[in-house]
Amino acid sequence: MGNFNFLPLVSFASFVVVLVLVCAQDQSGFVSIDCGIPEDSSYYDEKTDIKYISDAAFVESGTIHSIDSKFQKKNLEKQFQKVRSFPEGKKNCYDVQPPQGKGFKYLIRTRFMYGNYDNLGKAPDFDLYLGVNLWDSVTLENSTTIVTKEIIYTLRSDKVHVCLVDKERGTPFLSVLELRLLKNNIYETASDSLMLYRRWDLGATGDLPARYKDDIFDRFWMPLMFPNFLILNTSLMIDPTSSNGFLPPSVVMSTAVAPMNSSIEQIMVYWEPRDPNWKFYIYIHFAEVEKLPSNETREFSVFLNKEQIDTTSVFRPSYLYTDTLYVQNPVSGPFLEFVLRQGVKSTRPPIMNAIETYRTNEFLDLPTDQNDVDAIMKIKTKYKVKKNWLGDPCAPFGYPWQGINCSYTANNPPRIISVNLSFSGLTGQIDPVFITLTPLQKLDLSNNRLTGTVPDFLANLPDLTELNLEENKLTGILPEKLLERSKDGSLSLRVGGNPDLCVSDSCRNKKTERKEYIIPSVASVTGLFFLLLALISFWQFKKRQQSVKTGPLDTKRYYKYSEIVEITNNFERVLGQGGFGKVYYGVLRGEQVAIKMLSKSSAQGYKEFRAEVELLLRVHHKNLIALIGYCHEGDQMALIYEYIGNGTLGDYLSGKNSSILSWEERLQISLDAAQGLEYLHNGCKPPIVHRDVKPTNILINEKLQAKIADFGLSRSFTLEGDSQVSTEVAGTIGYLDPEHYSMQQFSEKSDVYSFGVVLLEVITGQPVISRSRTEENRHISDRVSLMLSKGDIKSIVDPKLGERFNAGLAWKITEVALACASESTKTRLTMSQVVAELKESLCRARTSGDSGDISFSEPTEMNVSMTVDPGVLPQPR
């Protein structure tokens, strides 16, 4: 549990208030870029008076587009009228040098609106990087969706690199890029960066967010109002100089929410993060907006996850002044909840004015060695290189600059080892800057217009093994050292196509014919000696490298077999028998876990196990079972998962669990499972095909939230007792994609088929294979298709539901399920389409009837409720 800090109130003289208001108009710490507007153009935004400039000076690639005219509405912010897209290259970057550089804290914001600018009608999905580290993924649902990504970051250098990385799911683009200078003494955390999760203006009556000029830092405060809450407000200014530094705007702090019923004793705000391992920092802003009579008080205690904030016993908001409670250490878990509980002596209920929540993002990847960066940037400037050379030369891994190759070793910055500038229009002499690229192994300067002599310093690059200077205009005599290295075999040297370049003294004054020279290596005793020495060194290097690679993937998540025995209490309790081995109950650091012991007959080898674990450790989603740790010791292999103790979807459908799922619960569980699969297909790199989607692999927690299990395992392990079955055909009869099964090739559409079958089970409550039916109607898809063709939806839906379902929605979901379970992959939906259909249906199901749930649920996953029951939460202390 993190401690909270309480920022006391400090009053300032009126002239300080005036000074702050004047500063509120100051944009000196702002960089506001409208991507896609003409070069050197600028304008002032009509609503905010912020000056926006063209992005042309900050990027060297991309194409400019206007969004579709039908989306250019009057109320659309001007910044979304144009975009810059990046159809070429895997990584494209913006380089921005803000007014204050290294060591200063900035709010960095990117905004995206597709607007069907390319007339393809398909919104893209791509990754967003800050420097060399993944910031977030950008997923747009449709043409009018506006996605905003915001991060608070202390600069490590004078420049900010914002990069878009193509995931082959549509062309990356950018609408707006904004930087806002913050005070270094606010949002102070141990984390490198804070990604905005939610920022709410509670009680705001408008639809638009508050921002600059109301907020001097131009933060977006989204309006949020809860049903059955009372809005409190004041026309007086909330003093923005209350000295906590956060300075939430007066327009935000002048409204608050409180329970409408005076008998309500508490407000509870909670949400379930998609990943229980996410770490959050929370900031709650309070200001009393009512002038209370002397005989009345408003005081309350604040709890986070049932523990009281470590301040005084009760908190009393100050009239017209802002106080901020914030968590000093990050909090995490599957369920985050903070409660405002009315004090015993209080005559007024609790209030809230504003909330900010941020998620940590540990930026662990290292940028390229600074010496190499300086050198390659000098080369770029010297030769006016016309390549997409922005951002980091080597990182992120897999996305180096065009013509650049790098070496990557653990805990060390990447180094540039190869530079290919052939056909780059280079002119002038070979610059001495190349000698500063000390790890350089390959240098290709061929097919340019370089002049002058070949410099001696190239022979002094210790690791250089290939040098190509062909087809230039070089003159003079080839340096003796280079010639010697070529002869002894330590350097592959190409200098053909330089008519005035002499490779020996005899041709000093002789014009050579235009031909290709490839200087052969000389087979000599010395050459053999160096070759043997190189082979020995290479063998030792590979041996060391192999010894490193066979170590634990992540020591923090690696457990010895003896620890597994202890965690499971010597394998005392068996939870179940999975396809890959038994699953045991365990307790790890006070938390329940499920340990899957992979049977010795199922393991395909350590390399496959390592690759599987390495992939699974990176997969995090609220609808996927979280992998907590692993073990590989000798022939013992185990995977440690979070514990889900409420059974599987199969238990509910088969009647093993006596509870009957309502229609809405079935839709929610189906949506959860679909979202998990959609993440495996589109949110993982490389994509993961589950290959064994079925109800028993969909676990249900106590809140009836579904989580997919056993994803990925079928790629590296065979089913126990079925060791002769190819890993390519893992799956369960009835759920197997018939088209791919026959070819033994599986894809995402194979999972779509299996999910369609599961969805039919959820709708009907019937088994997949019916032995009592004729051969052509044994499979559930055949039976449902036949009944649907007769227009009899009631005979399709599970009779246990009675009349408690929407026939129109049932018809629609049945059609979705059959479209998924189509025998032809071409006619099947994608999981993204399935998720969209289920979301819409669930929304309609919830609005068409009264669920009896008193909580208010936002699509943002945050919920608020009021209660008068003091027993469910801790008492004030």
Swiss-Prot record:
Phosphoserine modification sites? S726
> Signal peptide span per the entry?
1-24
Q: Which UniProt keywords apply?
A: ATP-binding, Cell membrane, Glycoprotein, Kinase, Leucine-rich repeat, Membrane, Nucleotide-binding, Phosphoprotein, Receptor, Repeat, Serine/threonine-protein kinase, Signal, Transferase, Transmembrane, Transmembrane helix
Reactions accelerated catalytically: L-seryl-[protein] + ATP = O-phospho-L-seryl-[protein] + ADP + H(+); L-threonyl-[protein] + ATP = O-phospho-L-threonyl-[protein] + ADP + H(+)
Task: Please give the Gene Ontology molecular function terms for this protein.
Answer: ATP binding; protein serine kinase activity; protein serine/threonine kinase activity
As stated in the Swiss-Prot or TrEMBL entry, residues carrying the post-translational modification Phosphotyrosine are Y641
**Cross-referenced CDD domains, in alphabetical order?**
STKc_IRAK
- Residues that span the membrane, as ranges: 518-538
EC top class, as a word: transferase
Its record classes its membrane topology as: Single-pass type I membrane protein
**Whereabouts are the LRR repeats?**
439-462, 463-484
Q: List Phosphothreonine occurrences by residue.
A: T727, T732
Domain Protein kinase per the UniProt entry, residue ranges: 569-842
* UniProt-annotated location(s): Cell membrane
Q: What is this protein called?
A: Putative leucine-rich repeat receptor-like serine/threonine-protein kinase At2g19230
Please spell out the taxonomic lineage of the organism that makes this protein: Eukaryota, Viridiplantae, Streptophyta, Embryophyta, Tracheophyta
